[in-house]
Amino acid sequence: MTTQQTVKIQLVRSPIGTKESHRATVRGLGLRKLNSVSQLQDTPEVRGMINKISYLLKVL
C-alpha cells in the first residue's frame, strides 16, 4: 500500500482585488478566510493551482 503525499497550504493574503479566476482557485483549494489552512493530496493538478496563486499562499 502506498501512502498519499499531502501538501498543507495557508492563505496569507486576501484575494480581494485579484482576478476572478484566482478567487475561484482559492475556493477550489478549500480556503475561505485569511490564515485558513487546507491539507490536500500532492497531485500535479493541485501543484498547478498552488503555482497559479502562489503570491497569496504559504506552503507549510
Curated annotation (Swiss-Prot):
Keywords: Ribonucleoprotein, Ribosomal protein. It comes from the Bacteria. Part of the 50S ribosomal subunit. HAMAP family: Ribosomal_uL30_B. Belongs to the universal ribosomal protein uL30 family. One of its GO terms (biological process) is translation. This is Large ribosomal subunit protein uL30. GO terms for molecular function: structural constituent of ribosome. It comes from Verminephrobacter eiseniae (strain EF01-2). One of its GO terms (cellular component) is cytosolic large ribosomal subunit.
